[in-house]
């Protein structure tokens, strides 16, 4: 491991102590709470949409969230370790077979829907652990 990788690993460990980042993949619907600065005040704004891509790795990892706002598609790129991100919450898991869901940009209505992923193995594991 070279020095840069070691420094990035230390930084990632330090940043993940203060903030928990859930595991999510493209296709998952997420709520990203973003800190917005307006003059003197800061407030938290929720941005809910479908994660359509994850890029990069380590400290430089980004994810793209797409939502439809007033009939217009809006995409926003968030760095995972950004100090402006207050929290990330996964609302539902999507069942997709691609890493990049850029084809959703051309789709409207029902064709833009993503089926929900049901993890039967995870449910069975929780049920056996509860017994």
UniProtKB/Swiss-Prot annotation:
GO molecular function annotations of the record: structural constituent of ribosome
GO cellular component terms attached to this protein's record: cytosolic large ribosomal subunit
Record key words, sorted: Ribonucleoprotein, Ribosomal protein
Region (Disordered): 110-131
Composition bias, Basic and acidic residues: 113-122
Gene Ontology terms describing biological process: translation
Pfam families, alphabetized: Ribosomal_L19 (PF01245)
Alphabetized InterPro entries for the sequence: Ribosomal_bL19, Ribosomal_bL19_CS, Ribosomal_bL19_sf, Translation_prot_SH3-like_sf
Function: This protein is located at the 30S-50S ribosomal subunit interface and may play a role in the structure and function of the aminoacyl-tRNA binding site.
UniProt similarity note: Belongs to the bacterial ribosomal protein bL19 family.
Protein name: Large ribosomal subunit protein bL19
